[in-house]
């Protein structure tokens, strides 16, 4: 009962857990997941089996090396990403934590290179109207897609516009997806230009089929990486304040 974030459970007179009458369960599943005897079930959760939690993880050195070795990849091969691979990545991302377990994320997947390039064209139309640096314009005119980098797939994260934690939940879930893609050897880069334009340009929203009342908070370009990196570049010194 101590793991229930909403304090929704209490012990009855017989010593068994029961629901608090005026409680507010957030459907996190902690109560079922923590029970060592599989004695609990939860009627409010989706009817799918609980997955076994990892019993043994790689050591901190392995995980730290994986995390700091992650790179933004902007050069992709022509190889498409299989639908089953994209679905596997989304399965990981949908289990990312959300505020109060709200799970309000909606995903948009563009898994066709031709459609991805069409999004770049539409975004470029807006960028030229809004003003773009001569250097970027010159790159575009030479055939270099600096917007979506000729990626074979793009995944965008949305939430309802009136949901206060949409940006945070999207960033966390996209990071889960990015690291899951890295673990599968894929290259990933955040789709900043497309995210920016999707927030202000109706044509992009229509092309993405963003549901009415939803906002795009972020996205990723994905593909088979053309190059691999041998080294991890240095970063600025840590800026920290201990209080």
Could you describe each region identified by the protein language model?
Residues 1-243:
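Acidic, surface-exposed loops and disordered segments
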């Amino acid at each position: 009962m101590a793991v229930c974030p909403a304090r929704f459970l209490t012990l009855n007179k017989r010593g068994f857990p029961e629901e608090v009458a005026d409680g507010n369960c957030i459907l996190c599943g902690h109560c079922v997941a923590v029970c060592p005897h599989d004695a609990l079930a939860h009627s409010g959760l989706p009817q799918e089996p609980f997955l076994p939690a990892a019993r043994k993880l790689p050591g901190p050195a392995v995980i730290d090396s994986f995390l700091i070795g992650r790179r933004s990849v902007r050069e992709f091969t022509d190889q498409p990403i299989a639908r089953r691979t994209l679905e596997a990545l989304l399965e990981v991302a949908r289990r990312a934590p959300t505020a109060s377990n709200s799970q309000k994320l909606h995903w948009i997947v563009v898994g066709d290179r031709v459609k991805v390039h069409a999004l770049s064209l539409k975004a470029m139309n807006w960028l030229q109207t809004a003003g773009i640096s001569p250097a970027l314009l010159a790159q575009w005119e030479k055939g270099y897609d600096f917007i979506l980098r000729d990626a074979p797939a793009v995944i965008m994260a949305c939430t309802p516009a009136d949901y206060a934690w949409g940006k945070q939940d999207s960033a966390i879930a996209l990071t889960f997806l990015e690291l899951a893609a890295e673990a599968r050897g894929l290259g990933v880069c955040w789709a900043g230009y497309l995210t920016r334009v999707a927030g202000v340009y109706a044509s992009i929203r229509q092309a993405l089929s963003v549901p009415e009342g939803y906002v795009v908070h972020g996205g990723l370009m994905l593909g088979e990486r053309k190059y691999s990196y041998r080294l991890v570049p240095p970063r600025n010194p840590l800026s920290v304040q201990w209080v």
